[in-house]
Amino acid sequence: MKNLVILSGAGISAESGIKTFRDADGLWEGHDIMEVASPYGWKKNPQKVLDFYNQRRRQLFEVYPNKAHKALAELEKHYQVHIITQNVDDLHERAGSSRILHLHGELLSVRSEKDPNLVYRWEKDLNLGDLAKDKSQLRPDIVWFGEAVPLLKEAISLVKQAHLLIIIGTSLQVYPAASLYTHASKDTLIYYIDPKAKNARLPQNIQCINESAVHAMQDLMPKLIEMAS
């Protein structure tokens, strides 16, 4: 089977009802990013940070995978698929995808404030006083602004091995994820799917599809299945 790597961003989940923080109506409106998604914000006002992520975690139980999520899961019948997602939701998992690398962490995980390897699955609200086994406060298992991306090397390795790369639902503005495609082989076929794809300044060998994730995947699926054989 050929290696198919997906780099997914907030746009694919937006079609399930999860707001994106770079759009005008996004979750970050009314919030200073550094106040709710940085080590500085956590140190300054941990309760505010917990409230913010508790709200986002609750929202997960009100949304469902869309046809684009399901199409990517379906491709596992035809390719060795690896999904590298910038999203912290679990919609790829619920759609049926089996190999998912969460570059920026997961809403349904929390970790020790002191030890990033002490990670727990967490579906309820997280409160001050909820402690890890090392007696430190639990925090969202999210890669905040200013923090290193621990899975970046693994993501780069996957992109290097890709025969086909699909970039879907990302504005390619959040680094280092935005530069991942540059690690692809010169022979790798690359599709970029986004409603504003044509506005992106990308190499000419990247095929831009100026559509939403759902519409683009519906159109592209027959071709992808044909190319797999």
Regions found by a protein language model. Name each.
Residues 1-229:
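Conserved catalytic core of sirtuin-type NAD+-dependent deacylases
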